[in-house]
């Protein structure tokens, strides 16, 4: 895998899955920008990779996905073509309904709307690359949470942390379907489920829930279950979608464990898969319009 001369942006690339993605892309020769709310948090990674003497240069820039002004500033400051955009940053299961300053529910703002704004803001740079790729980190949580167009921000329905998270991840998958309109520009967009991994993503999950998931004992010790992946293993599918020549021209798909996932209709005994509601072209087009209107009103 040779990415020499390619330029990449990885959101949330300072730790966890994002950091492993940055390491892999930089090792292959890509010039990588870590887009993070606190650029100083990425300094250890930047220094680590500089000391390693890899081919790809790594830098960090400020980006707050929940703030449209921050996203616009990042996109406006970008110069030249962009070959790879990895929409990796995310938050999960905020215990109470939290709103971004413009009124967006925070999980939807960070996980979907912010990335939609970033991708559309960088569209010209992606187009100019000739064969750019957008990689969207979704989650199996999308399976049971279709996007609610009537009350996406929980203004009227009771707030549920996991429904809010799942809805935002369903939106991520729908974005890949809606982005088929960019295929003529040479831009492919695919989503993935990285699997079960313990990272800072779980920082808002309370101890009771962690115990119910089986990953915390009575003494408060966190222990991954046998089927959990390491961050490096979880990032493998992101790197595959970002760099593998086998996926040239492939767009609007959902992957897990380095292969395209099967489509499922709802809850099934067998885990995994991608929900049919997240691949619905009509819902994808409707969401694209929803996102465009939301950005216009922000």
UniProtKB/Swiss-Prot annotation:
Keyword presence, Oxidoreductase: yes
Binding site residues for substrate: 139
Binding site residues for NAD(+): 9-33
InterPro entries noted in UniProt: NAD(P)-bd_dom_sf (IPR036291), Sc_DH/Rdtase_CS (IPR020904), SDR_fam (IPR002347)
Listed GO MF terms: oxidoreductase activity
UniProt keyword annotation of 4Fe-4S present: no
Record's protein name: Probable oxidoreductase
Organism: Streptomyces antibioticus
Organism lineage: Bacteria, Bacillati, Actinomycetota, Actinomycetes, Kitasatosporales
């Amino acid at each position: 895998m040779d990415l020499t001369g390619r330029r990449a942006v990885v959101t949330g690339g300072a730790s966890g899955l994002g950091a492993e993605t940055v390491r892999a892309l930089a090792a292959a020769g890509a010039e990588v920008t870590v887009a993070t709310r606190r650029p100083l948090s990425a300094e250890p990674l930047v220094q680590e990779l500089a000391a390693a003497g890899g081919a790809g240069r790594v830098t960090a820039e400020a980006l707050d996905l929940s703030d449209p002004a921050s996203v616009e500033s990042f996109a406006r400051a970008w110069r030249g073509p962009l070959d790879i955009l990895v929409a990796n940053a995310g938050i999960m299961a905020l215990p109470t309904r939290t709103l971004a300053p413009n009124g967006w529910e925070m999980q939807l703002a960070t996980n979907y709307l912010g990335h939609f704004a970033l991708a559309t803001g960088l569209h010209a740079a992606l187009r100019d690359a000739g064969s750019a790729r957008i990689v969207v980190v979704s989650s199996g949580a999308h399976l049971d949470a279709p996007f609610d167009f009537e009350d996406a921000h929980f203004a009227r329905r009771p707030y549920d942390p996991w429904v809010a998270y799942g809805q935002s991840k369903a939106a991520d998958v729908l974005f890949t379907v809606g982005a088929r309109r960019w295929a003529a520009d040479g831009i492919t967009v695919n989503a993935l489920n990285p699997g079960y991994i313990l990272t800072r993503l779980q920082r808002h999950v309370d101890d009771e829930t962690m115990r119910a998931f089986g990953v915390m004992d009575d003494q408060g010790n966190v222990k991954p279950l046998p089927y959990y992946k390491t961050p490096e293993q979880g990032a493998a599918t992101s790197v595959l979608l970002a760099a593998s020549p086998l996926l040239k021209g492939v767009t609007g798909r959902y992957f897990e464990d380095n292969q395209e996932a099967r489509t499922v209709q709802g809850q099934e005994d067998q885990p995994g898969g991608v929900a049919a509601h997240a691949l619905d072209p009509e819902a994808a087009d409707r969401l694209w319009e929803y996102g465009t209107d939301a950005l216009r009103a922000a």
